[in-house]
Amino acid sequence: ALPISGGEDNIEIGNPGWYIVVVKVTLEGRNYKYAVDFYKPEVYLTGDTSGGWDSFTEANMFTVPEGKGEFVSPAFVASGEVRMCIKLADIDWWKSEFIILGGKIEYRGTGEDQERAMGNAGQKAYLNFIDNKGAIK
């Protein structure tokens, strides 16, 4: 379990670091109900550059920086479109997809496919979520 606890209005994180925060909103009668979940910061490379689709294994996972720094993908096993995401239970991966365009992390959200960034075998993706920048090199 993650070192997170909370009271009525506060969330306390026992260990500083990177987390994925998911906020779910439901409507109960005329009131909104909010649920906040915390997950490990598991970011994945998927698609041709990872060797296949829907393979969310440790081999396709980015390294997580200590403190400030970059998340770094494994080396691309093939050339092609660079596709990245987080994987949440019961959510299609592409709904949490993001890519690198013009040196920035661009999130897909609910839209259509984005313009693609290409990578070559042996390269890696570098993501800095603090300043929303990314690179393929």
Q: Model features per residue range: what roles?
A:
Residues 1-137:
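Insoluble glucan recognition modules
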